[in-house]
Amino acid sequence: MERIFFYEDRNFQGRCYECSSECSDLSSYFNRCNSIRVENGNWILYEQPSYRGHQYYLWKGEYPDFQRWMGFNEYIKSCRFIPNHHGQYKMRIYERGDFQGKMMEFSDDCPNTYDRFSFRDIHSCNVSEGHWMFYEEPNYRGRQYYLRPGEYRKFSDWGASTARIGSFRRVHHMF
């Protein structure tokens, strides 16, 4: 069973809230979040309610302060469990919105998009199989964006404010 524990203070101190399913608004359970323990599963955490704001991808392990999950501050207001995926991974990326322009298909990780293909930005994407993470910078750094199967006609559909993607990878379950 998937489980995540949120702590108000660093090093797993202060008020604690246990969660075992997605939650669109964590505000009533804690005011701030400075440490997290993921007991099982992969999770996406969001800085704002209703799955908005900065996104953070966490897997089984301990995160004694928000810098460990590349957090910008102590706010986590919603969370989503990433379901298991068994099978292939497949995603198409496009250099322009609405699936226009050059297209490339991927079934594996890409640590540096700038080395891999000629266009700098990803404006739209179609995820047909698996769950993926986009990162704003190469080598899986910077802002993170979770993509589940579906169509993303513009970069704001995956929560980004720009089309800049420096790397991406498949979400593998680490139980």
Swiss-Prot record:
UniProt keywords (A-Z) are: Eye lens protein, Repeat
Pfam families assigned: Crystall
Task: Please give the Gene3D superfamilies that the UniProt record associates with this protein.
Answer: Crystallins
According to its UniProt entry, this protein's organism is Xenopus laevis (African clawed frog)
Q: Which family would the database say this protein is a member of? A: Belongs to the beta/gamma-crystallin family.
What name does the UniProt record give this protein?
Answer: Gamma-crystallin-2
Describe its assembly: Monomer.
* UniProt keyword Repeat, yes or no: yes
